[in-house]
Amino acid sequence: MANSAQARKRARQAVAQNAHNSSLRSRLRTAVKAVRKAIDAGDKAAAAEIFKNSQATIDSIADKKIVHKNKAARHKSRLSAAIKAMAA
């Protein structure tokens, strides 16, 4: 248990930061799922448009260090490859 005023404040801040970071991680997963859903539907134009919008979200979350930049790059790379494979 936090005994000093500073420790109590840091504990409160940690709870708030955890909630905020969790919501951002959820936004990342939602963005990836939206692109995957469009790919599964077979609509390349829609998938490309959703992917274009999702890239900003993915990069933004990586810039805030909620997820590692390499994980964000891996998501974008795999989604891009899946969209390109739709034409083949």
Swiss-Prot record:
Instruction: Write down the InterPro entries for this protein, in alphabetical order.
Output: Ribosomal_bS20, Ribosomal_bS20_sf
Q: Which GO terms describe its molecular function?
A: small ribosomal subunit rRNA binding; structural constituent of ribosome
Please, which domain of life does this record's source organism belong to? Bacteria
Task: Give the record's GO CC terms.
Answer: cytosol; small ribosomal subunit
* Record key words, sorted: Ribonucleoprotein, Ribosomal protein, RNA-binding, rRNA-binding
Where are the residues of the annotated region Disordered?
1-25
Q: Which Pfam families does the record associate with it? A: Ribosomal_S20p
GO biological-process terms attached to the record: translation
Q: Of which family is this protein a member? A: Belongs to the bacterial ribosomal protein bS20 family.
Function as written in the Swiss-Prot or TrEMBL entry: Binds directly to 16S ribosomal RNA.
**Do you know which NCBIfam families this protein is assigned to?**
S20
**Name this polypeptide is given:** Small ribosomal subunit protein bS20
